Amino acid sequence: MDSSRILKYESRLNFGSLCARRIRAKSEIPAVVYGKESDVLHIKIASNEFNKRFAKFTDNTVLILSDGKVERCVFIKDVSENITKGLIYHVDFYEVDRNRDIERYIAIKFVGASIGVKEGGTLSVLRTKIKVKALPLDLPEFVEVDLTPVKKGHQITFKDIVLPENVKLAEEDENLSILLVK
């Protein structure tokens, strides 16, 4: 397993504003883990570790929460922060079964300069996300689409996107255009 995904946590029994302030005073972040098939778990995580490693998370960032005994596969669902102070106040994690495929929308990252645009064409982006199906730990945070070979009058559809191994297209119509050059 990729150790960069692992985030250590400790369970906590005390809740409320006062307890949350005490946790933050110890350079920790109060958090909660919930999911469809699991009870709500109140935890605390090290602030510096979370800020350092996961400052630029996406909706598809998959983490492994570990207390040394139990590992939980989670997505970061929500982060409450004080922007003026630069502090994270609370994190919500959503637990999923790491052995079951899930469907998620992931970002499409366009790279390169289209030949058609260089010839005077106009690039129209119709979709910026794609629905895929994969195990949580195989889920990419984004897919890259190279625009370089796209000529004037051509388009790219969902089926043209090259997905990583173990990731399947979950769109209903794979022939829908994601971009075209006019």
Curated annotation (Swiss-Prot):
A molecular function GO annotation: 5S rRNA binding
Signal sequence interval, chain numbering: none
GO CC, alphabetical: cytosolic large ribosomal subunit
Keyword RNA-binding attributed: yes
InterPro entries found in the cross-reference section: Rbsml_bL25/Gln-tRNA_synth_N (IPR020056), Ribosomal_bL25/Gln-tRNA_synth (IPR011035), Ribosomal_bL25_b-dom (IPR020057), Ribosomal_bL25_C (IPR037121), Ribosomal_bL25_long (IPR001021), Ribosomal_L25_dom (IPR029751), Ribosomal_uL5_bac-type (IPR020930)
Coiled coil location: none
BP GO annotations: translation
Keyword terms, alphabetized: Ribonucleoprotein, Ribosomal protein, RNA-binding, rRNA-binding
Gene3D superfamilies noted in UniProt: Ribosomal protein L25, beta domain, Ribosomal Protein L25, Chain P
Quaternary structure and partners: Part of the 50S ribosomal subunit; part of the 5S rRNA/L5/L18/L25 subcomplex. Contacts the 5S rRNA. Binds to the 5S rRNA independently of L5 and L18.
Similarity annotation: Belongs to the bacterial ribosomal protein bL25 family. CTC subfamily.
Function statement: This is one of the proteins that binds to the 5S RNA in the ribosome where it forms part of the central protuberance.
Record's protein name: Large ribosomal subunit protein bL25
Lineage, highest ranks first: Bacteria, Pseudomonadati, Spirochaetota, Spirochaetia, Spirochaetales
Gene: rplY
